[in-house]
Design a protein with these regions (language model features):
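Single conserved hydrophobic/aromatic residue that forms the stacking wall/gate
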Residues: 1-10, 265-271
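GHKL/Histidine-kinase-like ATPase module
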Residues: 11, 16-19, 23-166, 227-262
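Extended, well-ordered alpha-helical scaffold/bundle regions in very large, multi-domain proteins
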Residues: 140-199
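Metal-dependent catalytic core segments for phosphate chemistry
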Residues: 171-176, 180-195, 244-270
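Long, highly charged low-complexity segments enriched in Glu/Asp and Lys/Arg with interspersed Ser/Thr
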Residues: 195-204, 209-213
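Cofactor-binding active-site loop characterized by glycine-rich and histidine/acidic residues
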Residues: 215, 228, 267-270
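N-terminal cationic and glycine-rich segments that engage phosphates or anionic surfaces
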Residues: 218-223
Length: 271
């Protein structure tokens, strides 16, 4: 109970910067006192979560983030604090809170954040011609890779999906969070171009890997459909997927087929 309680107190205390909490454990013969006070708030929380992960570095080998991105704003009685950064990894670690309560199933505040983040990233990439060469579309999954984020919301009368408060369902929150994140994060990207380009390079790399994986899946499916269609098992497919510019050689016997393969371009020719 004590360790679980301490962990909960420890994380929540990040959301209340400057306030000290004293935890006294009298269950043992020797009384144990633990004190928690974090002046850095959600910024310090993100650094705590990211402490053991491989940092995203610049060309000089230095940590890209001297400190995490921090957003603080208010609209229509909704107070928002958000901090985020990227590391070199592939997994996302995101903690949405409402009135100091963690929503493990997310909710409207998380949906608003994701929507704004995807919009800001794509807008910045397009405005700086970072996608033109690769002809890619960045998705939310690409942005998630290596993202660590804490969202803390303070709102009157929040609505949850159940008594456990694991998911926020207040409908008005999504647009408010989306508007605030979009506005503040756009400014941050414009003011920090060197860091922004390193972030985008990581995200674009994830998008390229996703695109390569998609094409590989399509190729496997296409070849599988050819086999299922009853075509001869000895048909050697060409390497490109488009019909234009390709040709089909039909020969009699394996020996002739071997000569045909040696004398043709496998990129455009099926034998």
């Amino acid at each position: 109970f004590v360790s679980r309680g301490l962990g909960d107190v420890y994380k929540r205390q990040f959301l209340n910067k400057g306030i000290k909490i004293t935890f006294t454990d009298s269950s043992q013969k020797k009384e144990k006192i633990s004190e928690f006070k974090f002046d850095g708030g959600v910024i310090e929380f993100v650094d705590f979560l990211d402490a053991k992960r491989e940092k995203l570095i610049n060309k000089n080998g230095n940590d890209v983030f001297k400190k995490p991105i921090f957003i603080e704003s208010k609209k229509d009685n909704v107070e928002l604090e958000c901090s985020l950064k990227w590391n070199k990894g592939y997994t996302e670690d995101i903690y949405p809170y409402t009135n100091n309560i963690h929503q493990k199933d997310g909710g409207t505040h998380l949906l608003g954040f994701r929507s704004a983040l995807t919009r800001v990233i794509n807008k910045y990439a397009n405005e700086n011609n970072l996608l033109k060469k690769n002809k890619l579309v960045i998705s939310g999954d690409d942005i998630k890779e290596g993202l660590t984020c804490v969202i803390s919301l303070k709102i009157p009368d929040p609505k949850f999906s159940s008594q456990t408060k694991d998911k926020l369902v207040s409908s008005e929150v999504r647009m408010i969070v989306e508007t605030l994140i979009n506005e503040k994060l756009s400014i941050w990207f414009d003011q920090n171009p060197s860091v922004a380009k390193i972030i985008l390079a990581k995200i674009i790399q994830a998008a390229m890997a996703r695109d390569v994986a998609r094409k590989a899946r399509e190729n496997v499916r296409r070849k599988g459909s050819l086999e299922l269609s009853g075509l001869p098992g000895k048909l050697a497919d060409c390497q490109i997927g488009k019909q234009e510019g390709t040709e089909l050689f039909i020969v009699e016997g394996d020996s002739a087929g071997g000569s045909a393969k040696q004398g043709s371009c496998l990129l455009y020719t099926s034998d």
